[in-house]
From Swiss-Prot:
A motif ('KMSKS' region) lies at residues 572-576. Belongs to the class-I aminoacyl-tRNA synthetase family. ValS type 1 subfamily. HAMAP family: Val_tRNA_synth_type1 (MF_02004). A motif ('HIGH' region) lies at residues 55-65. It catalyses: tRNA(Val) + L-valine + ATP = L-valyl-tRNA(Val) + AMP + diphosphate. GO terms for biological process: valyl-tRNA aminoacylation. Catalyzes the attachment of valine to tRNA(Val). As ValRS can inadvertently accommodate and process structurally similar amino acids such as threonine, to avoid such errors, it has a 'posttransfer' editing activity that hydrolyzes mischarged Thr-tRNA(Val) in a tRNA-dependent manner. Its EC number is 6.1.1.9. The lineage of its organism: Bacteria, Pseudomonadati, Pseudomonadota, Gammaproteobacteria, Moraxellales. This is Valine--tRNA ligase. Gene3D superfamilies: HUPs, Isoleucyl-tRNA Synthetase, Domain 1, Valyl-tRNA synthetase, C-terminal domain, Valyl/Leucyl/Isoleucyl-tRNA synthetase, editing domain. Disulfide bonds: none annotated. InterPro entries: aa-tRNA-synth_I_CS, aa-tRNA-synth_Ia, Anticodon_Ia_Val, M/V/L/I-tRNA-synth_anticd-bd, Rossmann-like_a/b/a_fold, tRNA-bd_arm, tRNAsynth_Ia_anticodon-bd, Val-tRNA_synth_C_sf. The gene is valS. The keyword Acyltransferase does not apply.
Length: 971
């Protein structure tokens, strides 16, 4: 059955603009999608849920966000089209330290500190800043085409989430899992807050190793080499003032007779013992280590083992205290004060270092100074060296929470993709330490604890509850804890707090969203925050969320871990390197001057600006073109491999922008060839020839491969399959194969109508197949094309995702087509090798062809002739000698193109001789370079390898040119 194209359909080609311009398309469709509510859950089918990893509320989009969002949106759109009740929920993080730093910098520019304003006014300023800049990143997420349900957008400081944070803190405290203690923490003297281990970066730096003489209390004691002192090496001379022991290895015979004896600590005159501990490396330095439990984590642990006192010498600015704080042993409170050496009081730690070394040299107890490569612990935000400092902090007791989280991964309730990250997670979880959750900031969730004048601590959801629970007198003055919670504490509750969890069992049981969408299906994240966030989410969720049978509920079933986006050279993208790319600059384009200004503005080290400007001008002489959202998204998906590093190459974006153009132009061609013509209303497989059988089979295989790719989180394979099918099979082959059919007066109208239907149907299915990866282009074309075959709808977003049909898979058709493609390819290769040009029709001789193959070729002879640009096909008998020809072999078949009369031998030989001379010269230059031992020794290995590859390519070209010359000379 067929139908005549209506007038509306006759306008189809005009509906698609001549050239593909993504800008207008993108703005139009996102607004429609959002206004019509297509991003909201449908309420039908099985649930599918992803929670967006909350970006910093005052931040802006970077390549990692772009990559992450492209993957999440592809997964969401795929599951929505598969009929799932889909929720992709957005939100932002208050980002304690980062946001407070930004606002403090703004105030500093006006010579105002947060202390000048006071806590309440400062927090008001932060909220103002959040309102001003907080929408930037959500606007940018929209530009990426992200189909998140904006009606459910959350912020970690929303009332509901803040109440959930208090509820969790109070319950963990009631369960004995939150405690307050004086412990050693990473203290950031610039930001004036404790940092977790994960917020400290080890930076390789050039330093020194100072060797000092510590003299024995007993003047009669001697070392094996006759000295009355030990030589102790340290990278931190200033902490000498807080030493409480010198440690040696118990099996170090050099010092066995000294264990238990005392040395006199320089400057202070205090006596400190010599202790034996296996922590000491016998072969490092002198084998003697100074122990400062208050200012070194390893020393703190060693001090606990030996019941050493702890002497804190620094205040929170990392300046020497007037009175050192003395603690008899770890875990106890300050019991005494020791007067500091007067000359050192108030000195910043590095000034104290300089003074101490000078004093040691002047007094003769400096032994030597050696250059030393060290790893300096620096705060990841401030960049300053952190100071191990003894402070009162709040901690989560992790061990009881960690065990269920370990078991959930071991028994498969949570699966890591790729699998390799399971081991990374396990290694960390099995060695996990208690979590310091207090931060000395003002912006964030204030710790729900109150103190009376005597230092008693009361924990509760609010002050009223605290007073009622503890029967406190109304006139008893209470002061709330000044600290806030680590940002990762609130984001650790992200999957359930954002769905409205209250901690009230009755309310939570009636919460549709909580019961429908939790546990969520997949968390998409970079490997760099597995510990920061993923592990903590698992622990917190499993403690508070329970299944109906009371067993712990996981936050998500799968953790899809992707690599970090780096530049084309594999370098980390950073402002200081000047290699950062903004996804929106790739989408919209940016001129060179704006790009230079963007990359050089606000550098920590302004001296880098010139170098960055030069590199930018070299790499992007014309600035960056506008590629559109679909090309950028498709690139991200195509790069989503299982490795830890994702090298982002702008050439890939350019290639996928060309892919968008290819789809656009192919659609226009198809529409122009069907408008005003008859198109079959229903499939007529009995009218299919090899091309239709083949393309329909290949479509099923593509659909099958894409489903498998989504199931295994291999979006790179999904992108590759879609690209190969649409470009290489549909556009390059099937569309070309239809041209001679539709232009042939001998072909029946019925068959032509069916070919037009197949052209449209395969493109329509391809658009649905590609939609999760490139939503805008596919929606725009689908709206015009789908109604032409009775498949229209409000939006492609809710159209059914293509599902492979086994009945349409045809292995024989695929094998036959592969063989035909090989024959056509052989003729094209001969044409190219002999420089015959595309305009000339060639005579072709075929040999070693079976009867069935001959029948197949004769049946599709018009297609073969049209695609290979052949004037005649002649079949040679077995053993028949062909005339002098250029030849190729396809399977068992031989393809010949007789050369006589096709070329001017003399002119062609002259041309080839010039090519030969040119290639020979290039070959010899590289061969000479590689024969130079100096070049091979000094050049980077990659450069040498690249030259070897070039040499091999030139050698191959020489062989081919000579073969062509021999063939032509024989004519």
């Amino acid at each position: 059955m067929i139908f005549i194209m209506t007038d509306a359909h006759a306008q189809s080609a005009q509906n698609i603009a001549t050239t593909y311009d993504p800008t207008d398309i993108e703005r139009k469709w996102y607004q429609i999608w959002e206004e019509k509510g297509y991003f909201k859950p449908s309420g039908q089918g099985d649930s599918f849920c992803i929670m967006i990893p909350p970006p910093n509320v005052t931040g802006s989009l970077h390549m990692g966000h772009g990559f992450n969002n492209a993957i999440m949106d592809a997964l969401t759109r795929y599951n929505r089209m598969m009929g799932k009740n889909t929720l992709w929920q957005p939100g932002t993080d208050h980002a304690g330290i980062a946001t407070q730093m930004v606002v403090e910098r703004q105030l500093a520019a006006q010579n105002i500190s947060r202390h000048d304003l006071g806590r309440e006014q400062f927090i008001d300023k932060v909220w103002e800043w959040k309102e001003q800049s907080g929408g930037t990143i959500t606007k940018q997420i929209r530009r990426l085409g992200s189909s998140v349900d904006w009606s459910r957008e959350r912020f970690t400081m929303d009332d509901g989430l803040s109440n959930a944070v208090k509820e969790v803190f109070v319950k963990l405290h009631e369960d004995g899992l939150i405690y307050r203690g004086k412990r050693l923490v990473n203290w950031d003297p610039k930001l004036q807050t404790a940092l977790s281990d994960l917020e400290v970066e080890s930076v390789e730096e050039k330093g020194s190793l100072w060797h000092f003489k510590y003299f024995f209390e007993d003047k009669s004691l001697k070392t094996q080499d006759g000295h009355d002192f030990l030589v102790v090496a340290t990278t931190r001379p200033e902490t000498l003032l807080g030493d409480t022991a010198v440690a040696v290895h118990p099996e170090d015979e050099r010092y066995a007779h000294l264990i238990g004896k005392n040395i006199v600590l320089p400057i202070t005159g205090r006596l400190v013992p010599i202790v034996a501990d296996e922590y000491v490396e016998k072969d490092f330095g002198t084998g003697c280590v100074k122990i400062t439990p208050a200012h070194d984590f390893n020393d703190y642990d060693l001090g606990k083992r030996h019941d050493l006192p702890i002497i804190n010498i620094f205040n929170k600015n990392a300046e020497v205290l007037a009175e050192f704080e003395y603690i008899a042993k770890a875990g106890e409170q300050i019991s005494d004060a020791i007067a500091a050496p007067a000359d050192y009081v108030g000195l910043e730690r590095f000034a104290a270092r300089k003074k101490l070394v000078a004093q040691a040299e002047a007094e003769g107890w400096l032994d030597q100074i050696q250059p030393y490569d060290l790893k300096a612990p620096r705060g990841d935000r401030s960049g300053v060296i952190v100071e191990p400092l003894l402070t009162d902090q709040w901690y989560v007791k992790i061990a009881p929470l960690a065990q269920p989280a370990i078991e959930a991964v071991q028994d498969g309730r949570i699966k890591f993709v790729p699998e390799q990250y399971t081991n990374m997670y396990m290694a960390w979880m099995n060695n996990i330490q208690d979590w310091c959750i207090s931060r000395q900031l003002w912006w964030g969730h204030r710790i729900p604890a109150w103190y009376d004048a005597e230092g008693n601590v009361y924990v509760g959801r609010n002050e009223e509850e605290v007073r009622a629970k503890n029967n406190l007198a109304a006139d008893l003055a209470l002061q709330q804890d000044e600290d806030v919670l680590d940002t990762w504490f609130s984001s650790g509750l992200w999957t359930f707090s954002t769905l409205g969890w209250t901690g009230d069992a009755k309310k939570d049981a009636e919460n549709y969203f909580l019961n429908t969408f939790h546990p969520t299906d997949v968390l998409v994240t970079g490997f760099d925050i597995i510990f920061f966030w993923v592990a903590r989410m698992i622990m917190m969720t499993m403690h508070f969320m329970k299944n109906e049978d009371g067993t712990p509920q996981v936050p998500f079933k799968t953790v899809y871990v992707h690599g970090l986006v780096r530049d084309g050279e594999g370098q980390k993208m950073s402002k200081s390197k000047g290699n950062v790319l903004d996804p929106l600059d790739l989408i919209d384009g940016i001129d060179l001057e704006s790009l230079v200004q963007k990359r050089t503005f606000g550098l920590m080290n302004p001296k880098q600006a010139e170098k960055i400007e030069k590199a930018t001008r070299k790499e992007f002489p014309e600035g960056i073109n506008s590629y559109g959202t679909d090309a950028v998204r498709f690139t991200f998906c195509a790069l989503a491999n299982t490795g830890r590093d994702i090298k982002f190459d702008l050439k890939r974006v350019e290639g996928y922008r060309n892919f968008c153009n290819k789809i656009w132009n192919a659609t226009r061609f198809v529409l122009m060839n069907v408008e005003g013509q008859t198109v079959a209303q229903e499939a007529r497989p009995e009218l299919w020839e090899l091309p239709e059988q083949w393309i329909m089979s290949r479509l099923q295989k593509a659909e099958q491969a894409v489903h498998q790719a989504f199931a295994t989180y291999r979006l790179d394979l999904a992108a590759q399959t879609i690209y190969d099918f649409i470009w290489n099979e549909y556009c390059d082959w099937y569309v070309e194969l239809t041209k001679p059919v539709l232009n042939d007066a001998e072909v029946s109208e019925e068959r032509k109508a069916e070919v037009r239907r197949v052209l449209l149907a395969v493109m329509e299915a391809s658009l649905r197949l590609a939609h999760p990866l490139m939503p805008y282009l596919t929606e725009e074309i689908w709206q015009t094309l789908a109604p032409m075959i009775g498949k229209g709808g409000d939006t492609i977003m809710t159209a059914k995702y293509p599902v492979p049909e086994a009945a349409k898979m045809n292995e024989q058709a695929e094998a036959d087509m592969q063989w035909l493609q090989g024959l056509i390819g052989a003729v094209r290769n001969i044409r190219g090798e002999m420089g015959l040009g595309n305009a000339r029709l060639l005579p072709v001789l075929l040999q070693n062809i079976s009867d069935s193959e001959r029948t197949q070729i004769e049946r599709i002879q018009p297609l073969f002739k049209a695609l290979a640009k052949v004037e005649s096909i002649t079949f040679l008998a077995q053993g028949e000698e062909p005339p002098l020809s250029s030849s190729s072999v396809v399977g068992h078949a031989s393809v010949f193109v007789p050369m006589k009369g096709l070329i001017d031998p003399k002119a062609e030989l002259g041309r080839l001789q010039k090519d030969l001379d040119k290639v020979q010269k290039q070959h010899d230059q590289i061969a000479s370079k590689l024969a130079n031992e100096g070049f091979v020794a000094k050049a980077p290995a990659a450069v040498v390898e690249g030259e070897k590859v070039k040499l091999a390519e030139f050698a191959d070209q020489l062989v081919k040119i000579k073969q062509s010359m021999e063939q032509i000379a024989a004519l």
